[in-house]
Amino acid sequence: MTAIAPVITIDGPSGAGKGTLCKAMAEALQWHLLDSGAIYRVLALAALHHHVDLASEDALVPLASHLDVRFVSTDGNLEVILEGEDVSGEIRTQEVANAASQVAAFPRVREALLRRQRAFREAPGLIADGRDMGTVVFPDAPVKIFLDASSEERAHRRMLQLQENGFSVNFERLLAEIKERDDRDRHRAVAPLVPAADALVLDSTRLSIEQVIEKALQYARQKLALA
């Protein structure tokens, strides 16, 4: 019987550093990577490319079931490959964001994408980045990490990121938005943002990203008995 490929799930709120951690771990272990937060945008873009009706659940389900997407991390940069093309920039447009909200509203589309995400589980292993990876998508994952940070620290990181890109931002407004999103995510009826019972909760508030990566890799290697 073929052994099931191991999965390391990295869940947590926006701004905790999940993306950076997942890319670093995928490169360090040479494992596959799943960015679940991008997958609805990728489906929306595929629908736009193929002129699929965004209001038709029946048309979207087969597209979601056979979505040709992969995520590649190289030197800390994540490439989103749809049907052989790098669409990392294209999925960040407002048109795609709006379309993603439409397709995510359909229950059968969500179910199809759940199965598609689980199909990323291939040897030698998978790093899964999201909000419900350890609780819903891969509840049997041998390594689960919930990466957290204070809302103030996450707002500060987001502010610096926006300022580096030339945007003027108000810290208090940013903090209020993050707190509102946290409250909504943690109290929603379906797949609330909570650590899995068997997850390591890693608070990155006072840690550098290098320290977070070191702690996460050490924990994963210990749990999986990796060299």
Swiss-Prot record:
Residues noted as binding ATP in the record, renumbered to the chain: 12-20
Enzyme Commission number:
2.7.4.25
Name listed for the protein in its UniProt record: Cytidylate kinase
Q: Per the record, what are the reactions this protein catalyses?
A: CMP + ATP = CDP + ADP; dCMP + ATP = dCDP + ADP
Q: Which UniProt keywords apply?
A: ATP-binding, Cytoplasm, Kinase, Nucleotide-binding, Transferase
Q: Where in the cell is it found?
A: Cytoplasm
Which InterPro entries has this protein been placed in? Cytidylate_kin (IPR003136), Cytidylate_kinase_dom (IPR011994), P-loop_NTPase (IPR027417)
- Cited Gene3D superfamilies: P-loop containing nucleotide triphosphate hydrolases
Which family does the UniProt entry place this protein in?
Answer: Belongs to the cytidylate kinase family. Type 1 subfamily.
The record, for CDD domains, names: CMPK
Its cellular-component GO annotations read:
cytosol
Q: Tell me one GO molecular function of this protein.
A: (d)CMP kinase activity
